[in-house]
Design a protein with these regions (language model features):
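Exposed, low-structure sequence patches enriched in small/polar residues
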Residues: 1-445
């Protein structure tokens, strides 16, 4: 009998249909070792690696009233890897992975960062520092009754304490949990809201084709790449002890996590898109972003914020006669012509344009944006905050695109950006200008 699915069919199927169809678990490595399917030698140090990814994505669209559209989305992704040194006694195993989950961090979303006069004071950071000892006591209580004698107390600045306190302070739905990787029931949605009903109001309808209000919110909690402690000893579940170089034991979870972060963005917090009756488009937006990075290595919270004000305008001139070729835009001729004559001329122009199949459109765009960003380093041990970087930037962009033919597009642009640093020690004001003309040739049209 020939081989089927890579199996030896002379006696029993090996290495098994479960492996062929990807249905085996982590225990398969031990099975393969016991059956002699793996090369066990001190000269071969290549471990057996397994990985698993859990990716949950939820989306929903709501329309509670006419012209009001709400898009909800929630994601949770957990990646876990396992590396087994099966060639050594006891099969030493290393675990690693990463984790991301959408959440809501509105409690301090619009909170200011403070300034130099008040020491960059942050009420949320003060609340976080006040919770550290309470969470340390709760973690320490989990080790009561342990048979391990003379163990060190729980480290107040370890991941087991700081991460739960961090989530409880800056996110919603934590409920005082001690979980480093929040469970599925703590998954919270992000949203995008769009309302277009203003264009139906009498005065607005007379001047605008459309008016849309926009709002979007996104917040993601992330655990960077982590790995298990090589000297970790299990006590109960994910609780255990890490053996130090001097032989002492310190209560700790299995994983060595150096950083976690919360990335939050209002993009925009409030935005208005308008289209006038003459096809002039305008956009006004206010955006904010915030990144909170908790470092267990430096025992700091690095907080960075940016605020953007954006104004944009665009206008399209159809069939614009720039170089005196092609059918120009229609103009009203001097002299007395009847309505029938005008209709004949318009019909003739339409037919001419249709025959050529080319509209020499001129698209213009003007964007003005102002951004202020700053980064603050907050020391958890001392409670002191200091500015580390920041700047303000004003950018003006002007662009015009002209369609020469179905394959050629002429573009002219001008960009000007002025940067002013927040700290005089970090640099000096700079201004950059870019301008030019480009000709784009496309074969796909």
């Amino acid at each position: 009998v020939g081989d089927v699915f890579g199996q030896r069919t002379g006696s029993v199927m090996a290495p098994g249909l479960g492996l062929a169809f990807g249905l085996t678990g982590d225990e398969y490595i031990e099975t393969a070792r016991n059956n002699g399917w793996l090369l066990c030698s001190d000269d071969v140090a290549t471990p057996a690696n397994t990985s698993a990814t859990e990716d949950l994505q939820l989306r929903a669209t709501l329309e509670p009233v006419r012209d009001l559209k709400i898009d909800l989305s929630a994601t949770r992704t957990a990646t876990k890897s396992r590396s087994v040194q099966f060639m050594y006694e006891g099969s030493p195993t290393t675990y690693s992975g990463s984790f991301t989950m959408t959440t809501i961090s509105l409690r301090s979303a619009l909170e200011g960062m403070g300034d130099a006069n008040n020491g960059y004071n942050s009420p949320s950071f003060n609340e976080f520092c006040g919770k550290v000892n309470a969470f340390r006591d709760r973690v320490q209580a989990q080790y009561e009754g342990s048979s391990v004698q003379d163990a060190n107390p729980v480290n107040a600045y370890g991941a087991d304490v700081l991460i739960p306190a961090f989530l409880d302070t800056y996110t919603m739905g934590a409920g005082g949990s001690l979980d480093i990787f929040p469970v599925l029931t703590r998954l919270l949605p992000n949203w995008s809201i769009r309302y277009g009903g203003l264009a139906k109001m009498p005065w607005i309808r007379d001047h605008f084709k459309s008016v849309n209000l926009n709002h979007s919110y996104k917040s993601v909690y992330s655990v960077g790449s982590y790995a298990s402690y090589s000297s970790w000893m299990e006590y109960m579940g994910d609780l255990g002890y890490v053996k130090a170089a001097d032989g002492s034991l310190t209560p700790s979870s299995r994983y060595n996590i150096s950083t976690v972060s919360i990335n939050e963005a209002f993009s925009p917090l409030l935005g208005v898109d308008m289209t006038f009756n003459n096809n002039l488009t305008c956009k006004v937006e206010y955006r904010t972003t915030r990144v909170l990075n908790l470092s267990m290595t430096s025992v700091h919270i690095n907080e960075s914020q940016s605020k953007d004000w954006v104004i944009g305008m665009g206008y399209k001139i159809s069939n614009f006669n720039l170089f005196g070729s092609g059918s120009g835009s229609s103009r009203k001729a001097a002299g007395g012509k009847g309505r029938n004559d005008d209709n004949k001329n318009n019909s003739s122009k339409t037919q001419t344009t249709s025959k050529k199949g080319i509209n020499h459109d001129l698209n213009t765009r003007l964007d003005v944006s102002f951004r202020r960003q700053a980064a603050i380093t907050r020391d958890i041990a001392s409670g002191v905050s200091s500015a580390s970087s920041g700047n303000s930037a004003l950018k003006i962009s002007l662009q015009a695109d002209y369609t020469l033919s179905r394959m050629l597009t002429l573009t002219a642009y001008y960009d000007r950006q002025t940067n002013t640093p927040l700290l005089s020690s970090s640099g000096y004001p700079t201004t950059t200008q870019d301008f030019g003309v480009s000709l784009k040739f496309s074969l796909t049209r």
